[in-house]
A protein has these predicted regions:
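ATP-dependent helicase/translocase motor core
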Residues: 1-184
């Protein structure tokens, strides 16, 4: 807990924690080749898990829609909204600003890598929750994925196979991608 407060989750995962004269590794990065089977086995032993509706406080019954863990440590929180049920990504942002107290351990600065608010169209992210002052950045691909062809603009391209925000699940929140983000 002390190391997480001082260094943040990314640094603790990268460097481990010292206990007396030993370092306890909490994460193993993907080795640069598959020839080192010992390191590959360690990397494959990392446990990425997801909890839906995580009750994060002993003071109330508030829940997070989705929380991602690495080897038991929370690394990402998500508020997921569905415009068909009347809520958009902006409701998720307001939920973080109004209902998620940064005094709670999971929301304190650098305790998690990132907090996402997402719906079927858009994704926004913040790394520092601070009530109404919390600033969210767009985490979208842009129209035409940034290629110099019209139409230009914010948002996400149409996905013929499903949701416009599919890239978050299929490209970012994968074991390989998250491991690279943490390691680098």
């Amino acid at each position: 807990d002390e190391k997480l407060r001082k260094l943040g989750i990314i640094e603790v995962l990268r460097k481990g924690v010292k206990h007396f004269d030993k370092t306890v590794d909490l994460f193993f990065h993907q080795p640069s080749s598959n020839y080192n089977t010992k390191d590959l086995d360690k990397y494959n032993a990392n446990i990425f898990s997801v909890t839906q509706e995580l009750v994060y406080s002993s003071d109330n019954a508030n829940r997070l829609d989705l929380t991602l863990f690495l080897n038991g440590l929370p690394i990402i929180t998500c508020e997921l909204k569905n415009p068909l049920s009347g809520q958009t990504v902006h409701n998720g942002i307001r939920q973080y600003q109004n209902d998620r107290d940064p005094k709670e351990k999971i929301f304190s600065f650098a305790r998690c890598m990132v907090h996402f608010a997402a719906d079927t169209e858009l994704v926004f992210m913040s790394t520092h929750l601070n009530h109404k002052k919390t600033f969210f950045l767009p985490f979208n691909k842009g129209l035409n994925e940034g290629k110099p062809v019209s139409p230009f603009g914010a948002g996400n391209p149409v996905n013929p196979q499903g949701l416009k925000t599919h890239y978050l699940w299929e490209e970012i929140l994968t074991k390989h991608s998250l491991s690279n983000i943490i390691y680098k």
